Amino acid sequence: MPKYTGPLPGSDFARQVAGVNLPPFRGTISGEVVAASGGYFTLGVANIRGKIVRVVASVSTAGKADSQVPTGTFNVRINGTTALSTPPVIAHVSGEAAQHKTTWSEAGDTGITQAVVNNAACDFGVGDILSWSFAYTGSDSPTAKMANPSIVVETDPIPPV
């Protein structure tokens, strides 16, 4: 059945509907992490044309070590091609407790790098596969381990032409 293309109530109607019907893609690795995750994990398959607009990464515990700072680097791919020009990074900061951290800009956490979406590589089509990875670097036996790395990939639809 062909997709209905209009007339629509407004120029941003598809975005409004997608905001309700297209929740963000989400992924989590449950538990403590002290080694690379071992590859990419599927976030889902796109059911509409769209683009990635924001990526937020979080950990329930950022880890702690006196040497070799625990650091987690995230990445997002569309059909195997990275969609980020700068991946989000969460790192322990000396003197801080092993605490929850997020790259959400409003949180104001320290030791983080916010994701920058590559506008030349962020579009996806129906059937495209979105995936993510998490890579840990730092001490193999930290005082506190990094735990529960999670990612939220927010998208907007691309209106029909």
Give the residues covered by each predicted segment.
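Surface-exposed, low-hydrophobicity beta-strand/loop segments enriched in small/polar/acidic residues
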Residues: T5-L8, D12-V161
